[in-house]
């Protein structure tokens, strides 16, 4: 039977076209350490020029979750790749690692070359922001597994750090200052609740502007996750950082303790930073308690850094020079977990 594979739902020619379209975007991410080109069986990266005493490779993998469903609804696919990169590289930079390279995995019901090109365009933009090379990936057309409009997206990154410079959090003490770096919005966590609250129960439109939002709801919800790699690496060159937390799923309550040693907690000063209007809209429409908000969302802070009190103001200034909005949002205390304003739990 001629074209048997195509009749089964797999279009090889469309796959070839997608690869051809993505090459120009991938090329913009290349570093001098990359060996070979796109299309090999494996991506190669030369580590011989890194003058580190005890080089340690740090890896991370993640996906975008149900934020993808917003991309499907809006038929907008050119920024969701930034989210995939951000979720991976932010996780390894908190350990002091410089991201070196990234690989992506796209699984779809139907290979549409223009859509796949847009996804990879976003991935490439994320890699440029993080300074890492997109050295490989997989695009799998899986009819019957996904509908023709659906796809899933995941990524994998590897970075490097000198062993003596790994940021572990183990030296954090009571009295260290916590600096928060502003998020761009919801980032890539909590979207199952976002859809239920705003779209299903609230019946809000993606095309309308609500409350204090400056953009239509769909654009607000699809804002890419902020990538903190370059400002954090610059910070690490100039100051000692005792711990870092990427505020993802689980919000403040789950993620800040991940960087803290036993016997140390965090006290957060509410009102010390701006909480973006999208979080207020979610809380109002969904009638969500404040504790639940801080246990799910980043609430306007995408990264938390623990430093000595005497360094805090200089670090806020340095981060500002790197284009970040940074605020002193609290400090570490004897205890455990996260409390707010004078030791009160929400």
Swiss-Prot record:
Q: Could you tell me which pathway this protein works in?
A: Purine metabolism; IMP biosynthesis via de novo pathway; 5-amino-1-(5-phospho-D-ribosyl)imidazole from N(2)-formyl-N(1)-(5-phospho-D-ribosyl)glycinamide: step 2/2
Coiled coil (residue ranges): none
Cite the CDD domains for this sequence.
PurM
Biological process (GO) annotations?
'de novo' IMP biosynthetic process; adenine biosynthetic process
Q: Which GO terms describe its molecular function?
A: ATP binding; phosphoribosylamine-glycine ligase activity; phosphoribosylformylglycinamidine cyclo-ligase activity
GO CC, one annotated term: cytosol
Q: Which HAMAP family is this protein grouped with?
A: AIRS (MF_00741)
Would you tell me the protein name for this molecule? Phosphoribosylformylglycinamidine cyclo-ligase
Q: Which organism is it from?
A: Bacillus cereus (strain ZK / E33L)
What does the record give as the organism's lineage? Bacteria, Bacillati, Bacillota, Bacilli, Bacillales
Per the record, the gene is purM
């Amino acid at each position: 039977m001629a074209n048997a594979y195509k009749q089964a739902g797999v279009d090889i020619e469309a796959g070839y076209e997608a690869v051809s379209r993505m090459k120009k975007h991938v090329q913009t991410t290349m570093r001098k350490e990359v060996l070979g080109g796109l299309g090999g069986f494996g991506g190669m990266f030369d580590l011989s020029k890194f003058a580190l005493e005890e080089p340690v490779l740090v890896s991370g993998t993640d996906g975008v979750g149900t934020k993808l469903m917003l991309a499907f609804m809006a038929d907008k696919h050119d920024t969701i790749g930034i989210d995939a990169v951000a979720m991976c590289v932010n996780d390894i930079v908190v350990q002091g690692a410089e991201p070196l390279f990234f690989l992506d995995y796209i699984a779809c019901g139907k290979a549409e070359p223009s859509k796949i090109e847009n996804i990879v365009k976003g991935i490439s933009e994320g890699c440029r922001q993080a300074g890492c090379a997109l050295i490989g990936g997989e695009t799998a057309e899986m009819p019957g597994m996904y509908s023709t409009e659906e796809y899933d997206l995941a990524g994998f990154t590897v970075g490097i750090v000198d062993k003596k410079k790994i940021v572990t959090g183990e030296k954090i003490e009571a009295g260290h200052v916590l600096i928060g770096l502003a998020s761009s919005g919801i980032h890539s966590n909590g979207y199952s609740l976002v859809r239920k609250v705003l779209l299903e129960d609230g019946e809000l439109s993606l095309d309308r502007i609500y409350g204090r939002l400056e953009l239509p709801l769909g654009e607000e919800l699809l804002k890419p996750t902020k990538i903190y790699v370059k400002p954090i690496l610059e910070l690490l060159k100039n100051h000692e950082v005792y711990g870092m937390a990427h505020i993802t799923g689980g919000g403040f309550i789950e993620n800040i303790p991940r960087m803290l040693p036993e016997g140390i907690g965090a006290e957060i000063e509410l009102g010390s930073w701006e909480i973006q209007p999208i979080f207020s809209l979610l809380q109002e429409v969904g009638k969500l308690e404040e504790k639940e908000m801080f246990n799910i969302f980043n609430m306007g802070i995408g990264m938390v850094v623990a430093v000595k009190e005497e360094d805090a103001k200089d670090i806020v200034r340095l981060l500002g020079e790197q284009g970040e909005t940074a605020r002193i949002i609290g400090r570490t205390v004897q205890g455990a977990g996260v409390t707010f304003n004078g030791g009160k739990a929400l």
